[in-house]
Amino acid sequence: MAGVALKQEITFTGPTVIGGTLVPAGDYKVTHQMQGTEHVMIFKQIGGKAEAKAKCNLVPLTEKARTTEQRYNENAKNEHVLVEMTFRGDTSKHVLEP
């Protein structure tokens, strides 16, 4: 997977929905894997048991990302839903499937 790091860390300041799974606030290890032809992001809570998976699409950036950023939407239950991630130094952003 050229242009993206296979492992990252991310902190959620509040409960967050990832791929349909609600996880609590905390620090997470994020692993990018290929399952067949699909890209999958796996989130595992550091020091906890929470885990979530989401399919993602890689969207090329015009240059290396200068910062790490996340983009969220809000669902009908007013929960934060992670929809996109960009990690500093990567040349693609991760767009998560709901």
For each of these PLM feature ranges, what is it?
Residues 1-17:
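Short acidic, Pro/Gly- and aromatic-enriched capping/linker segments at domain boundaries
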Residues 6-8, 26, 37-39:
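A generic structural signal for short beta-strands and their flanking turns/coil linkers
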Residues 11, 32-33:
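Solvent-exposed, non-transmembrane regions of integral membrane proteins
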Residues 24-25, 52, 93:
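A sequence-level detector of short linear motifs
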Residues 26-32:
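A short tyrosine-centered beta-strand micro-motif
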Residues 38, 42-87:
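Mid-chain, structured segments of secreted extracytoplasmic proteins
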Residues 89-97:
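Short, low-complexity, Pro/Ser/Thr/Gly-rich segments in the mature regions of secreted, periplasmic
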